Design a protein with these regions (language model features):
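N-terminal organellar transit peptides
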Residues: 1-110, 116-209
């Protein structure tokens, strides 16, 4: 869970009109983005950066203003910039519309943190999802005093992440601190048993089941 920015991804634009395509040809990515937006479904795929956090936040605010119907977020991410994950986590809790998290592929590091922004009963995953929890990491150079400051910030971040995991899973803070000392991988079923996930689902219809 890096505490320094990674390379930003380009913003994804949502067009006002879907492009015309000849019969049988695949739709453009912008058309698919628009359809996903209208279905109140957001995607968090790939590394989490300030650019992707800005994009997700913009969409969450727009969907929240449009309706108080549930918003579904599909998450498949190895993590990334911790503070960008914090942004998504906090905005999900800030808006009025309920959000449902659906893990797929793998949900790791800072992505696990934002995944835990919703109550357990609204946390789902698909059968082959894997989860990773661990302590944040990062590098620092420069004067010894700056390195010491950075080390203290890493310690604070580790404790904050552990408290979030403990709060959302029902585990003790001490147990979580031990679990995240090293990389802890969990299968979908293990994530249910740990308290990260409420249910494993295979179809969208099961979200409201």
């Amino acid at each position: 869970m890096a505490t320094h920015p990674v390379k930003e991804q380009h913003d994804m634009e949502t067009p006002e009109d879907a492009p015309d395509t000849p019969a049988g040809e695949p739709r453009s990515s912008s058309y698919l983005e628009e359809k996903a937006f209208k279905s109140r479904t957001l995607l968090i795929f790939g590394a989490i950066t300030d650019a992707s956090a800005r994009d997700v936040t913009r969409r969450l605010i727009a969907l929240d203003a449009d309706s108080d119907a549930p918003i579904d977020i599909l998450v498949s991410s190895p993590g990334g910039h911790l503070e960008s994950g914090d942004t998504i986590h906090d905005v999900v809790r800030f808006i009025a519309a309920p959000v449902r998290m659906i893990g797929t592929g793998w949900v790791g590091s800072a992505a696990t943190h934002l995944y835990l922004a919703v109550p357990r009963e609204r946390r789902f995953c698909l059968p082959n999802t894997r989860f990773l929890i661990h302590q944040p990491s990062g590098g620092a150079g420069g004067p010894a005093s700056d390195i010491a400051i950075h080390a203290q910030e890493i310690i604070k971040a580790r404790e904050r992440i552990a408290r979030t995991i403990a709060r959302e899973t029902g585990k003790s803070f001490e147990a979580v601190m031990t679990d995240i000392e090293r990389d802890r991988w969990l299968s979908a079923q293990e994530a249910v048993e740990y308290g990260l996930v409420s249910r494993i689902i295979e179809r969208k219809s099961e979200l409201s089941g």
